[in-house]
Amino acid sequence: MLIGTLEIGRDAPPVIVAELSGNHNGSLERALAIVESAAACGAHALKLQTYTADTMTLDLNEREFTSSSPLWKGRSLHNLYQEAYTPWEWHEPLFRRARELGMLAFSTPFDFTSVDFLQSLDVPAYKIASFENIDLPLIRRVAATGKPIIMSTGMATLAELDEAVQAARDAGCRDLVLLQCTSSYPADPAYSNLANIPRLRELFNCEAGLSDHTLGIGASVASVALGATLIERHFTLARADGGVDSAFSLEPQELAQLVRETKIAWQALGTVHIGPTKIEMGSRSKRRSLYICRDLEAGAVLTPDNLRAIRPGHGLPPKFLDQLLGKRVTRRVARGTPASWDLIG
């Protein structure tokens, strides 16, 4: 499948999406610097989040409207979203800069108004966040745009995922990527369940990838071996700068390494082929083979003392050793002669 000009699939290197989230810390200048750094690291796409605090929650301090996550424990949801949101007037300059640097640029909408706003910017795709994968009306509204959908699967049961996928397809979605996701911040690798990736592809007949909140890049690189074709990571200039999502975001050197290592992992997958590869053919002549290891006169008997399996591989294969032992050579043979059938007549 294509998103813009990016090919998403197992015949192409994994697409790496850098998520800006709230790491701009309220500064457009910093947000643009993050975009430029992501491009310099080789990220293929930039993703924003499009909401306001009021479209996400209510401005209340009751317990159910406060965060229980260790990172944000006790803070009101409204306050968190007010701090983290990306002003809508920033979207156009951020998208423009990303495109200038060769990246795809899209966003996650959280309500109908944000879908309509993103449509006005002609985004090439939409992301559905894990916390919204049960919001079927929102999914239908996004699907009705006809744009590809990337959907995180965090917290969802199989039945809920089936409902979400069916809602998207019934409303017009033709290109879908499901991302294995653990909605914990940061996430413990023990709960990443990367083995779900091929299962998602099989069950829903779509591309599958990973939205990764673990620390480091190990889980992300490993996901490629299980068929991940798109990997999303939060990104910041420096975790020490702080910010609502900085604790589980990659820094530039990590993102650059992720781009390199996931491409290497994809290349290393290769194909199902048991047998020598093209680049191994020259090494076959350096394998073990049978050699005469003592000077022999005509009529001498071949024994373990004068016939051995050694490197290189210009003699008969070692599997013929037992057949040759006890045979007599028909002529004088010098030490270092590769064994051949004509030595015994």
Where do the language-model regions lie?
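Catalytic cores and adjacent flexible loops of soluble metabolic enzymes
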Residues: M1-G345
